[in-house]
Amino acid sequence: MKKLLLNYNLNRKKKIQKKPHIILPNNYFTNKSEYNCVIPQNIFQTWHTKLLPPLMFNAVQKIKRNNPRFHYKLYDDNDCRELIKKYFRPDVLDAYDRLIPGAYKADLWRYCVLFIHGGIYLDIKYAPYKGFKFINLCESEHYVLDADRAGIYNALMVSLPGNQVLYKAIRRIVENVQNKYYGNCCLTPTGPKLLTNFISTNDPLVDLQHSLIDVDNKFIYYQNIPVLKTYSGHDVEKSYASIKKHYGELWNERNVYI
């Protein structure tokens, strides 16, 4: 297996250090008061700039308030590129640079940041629903079944560092860019359809579900309870703030690669 990283040994076996139990009173989601966390307590999100639209800013603040023990980091486009440049081989950075849709770049980056640091990636259009806390997801890795039940919805990913599903996804994106591969839908080059090559939708770790009612009402369910919801107005804010065409439009035009 070729090395993926410049400064990371894939063959190094790390012991998972279980952190001390954390007491969280008044958690609506569960009656548990103690959690044996193995997932690093990081929350990662990305937007093309650090200057967020007002409703998006409020959603981010809600995440921070609900999860004070977590390290939160917002990456802009430059931060995303610098992380890949720092930790990964030149062909991964080249793939990032040659992807045109911002969403495709964000797909590659989210796999990279979780592979390096571990933690939780969440699309910036989501906010906690009814006080949900991410500590509920930190006892194991988690993936989300997409609404069509045929893909892995990558708007939320919970991962240990060194995750091999993410490693394989990164390598496949590099190959797709090099071959200018489009696949049979716009979610194939970097997103939910790509991930199903490396983890089955029937895998026990795929234990959350994406539910789509309309553009302002997308939910993520855990144990049949809604825990995350898109904030109202996110679609309007994104349309005003976007600096590139939607990835679906670019895919239809066969214009997702440089």
Name the predicted role of every residue range.
Residues M1-A106, L122-I258:
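Glycosyltransferase-associated regions of secretory-pathway enzymes
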Residues D107-G119:
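Small-residue hinge/turn detector
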